[in-house]
């Protein structure tokens, strides 16, 4: 390999390195932008979760009837009567009870 070929090879290698460096810088800027966007979205998500938690707490405080009804539905779903006639007794084969259903369907 003569000097000109060696110089041309180094020049080509140098050009390739410059192109690669430019691509890396562009990727670096893109990653930085994505990290900033991710941080903003995480903060927004945290604020929204706090707001949702606050609203849910207000809803439960304003509507204790719903909380009680949900509790009764849970007991009924576990297979127990919630009606006045058979309260606390296990339902046979998880059959529906019209008295319990009437309580759950009240508004």
UniProtKB/Swiss-Prot annotation:
The keyword Cytoplasm applies. One of its GO terms (biological process) is DNA replication. Binds 1 zinc ion per subunit. GO terms for cellular component: nucleoid. Signal peptide: none annotated. Keywords: Cytoplasm, DNA replication, DNA replication inhibitor, Metal-binding, Zinc. Homotetramer. Interacts with both DnaA and DnaN, acting as a bridge between these two proteins. Involved in control of chromosome replication initiation. Inhibits the cooperative binding of DnaA to the oriC region, thus negatively regulating initiation of chromosome replication. Inhibits the ability of DnaA-ATP to form a helix on DNA; does not disassemble preformed DnaA-DNA helices. Decreases the residence time of DnaA on the chromosome at its binding sites (oriC, replication forks and promoter-binding sites). Tethers DnaA to the replication machinery via the DNA polymerase beta sliding clamp subunit (dnaN). Belongs to the YabA family. This is Replication initiation control protein YabA. The lineage of its organism: Bacteria, Bacillati, Bacillota, Bacilli, Lactobacillales. The gene is yabA.
